[in-house]
């Protein structure tokens, strides 16, 4: 099914694909009348990604029906990263088995990316009984993950009433990042019970790569449960990650 969709801000779209490409090698994007979506799992089956971009966030969204396009994420990322901040991104598909990517700025540059067959798995985003919901600034999360990487390959999230802690412990070193609602970096915190869970630092680093410093990131987790991380894309869109916990001995 032919389609043409236009996104004002090629770099923003490229950052989304760049983040996803750190975790998955290929993806099947569903282009439907209500919007563009993608759900995939990394090869190690540790992280589930769910991308939802409603038609309303595009400046033009023209499709009659539904189309699934499979792409090599590394190739897709490299093309998109050729766009500048103010470039307009146009994605088109005609009758041929190519995705046409046009970057409109000081010149109009068009790339043709061959589509590939991607196995579409039935992946559900489960409703889990999380006991914590924390909203933090993207900058805080990114810096905490960098701090933790100096000490350990895992980071522990600890939530108590009015307090959210990110902590990493190595053989000889440790680091603790403590936030309360009095701190600018913690925007909201709801804790049903004291909760602890640990996660892999390298996965969190990949998940946080595309987050802007001023973005609001929603973290949900429970005791030794997966971490659900959501961040909004132009208010109505959303990128969600579900990261399996590190079970500590």
UniProtKB/Swiss-Prot annotation:
Disulfide bonds: none annotated. InterPro entries: DNA_clamp_sf (IPR046938), Pr_cel_nuc_antig (IPR000730), Pr_cel_nuc_antig_C (IPR022649), Pr_cel_nuc_antig_CS (IPR022659), Pr_cel_nuc_antig_N (IPR022648). It holds the Pfam family PCNA_C. Keywords: DNA replication, DNA-binding. The keyword Hydrolase does not apply. It comes from the Archaea. Coiled coil: none annotated. GO terms for molecular function: DNA binding; DNA polymerase processivity factor activity. GO terms for biological process: leading strand elongation; regulation of DNA replication. Homotrimer. The subunits circularize to form a toroid; DNA passes through its center. Replication factor C (RFC) is required to load the toroid on the DNA. Belongs to the PCNA family. Sliding clamp subunit that acts as a moving platform for DNA processing. Responsible for tethering the catalytic subunit of DNA polymerase and other proteins to DNA during high-speed replication. This is DNA polymerase sliding clamp. It comes from Thermococcus sibiricus (strain DSM 12597 / MM 739).
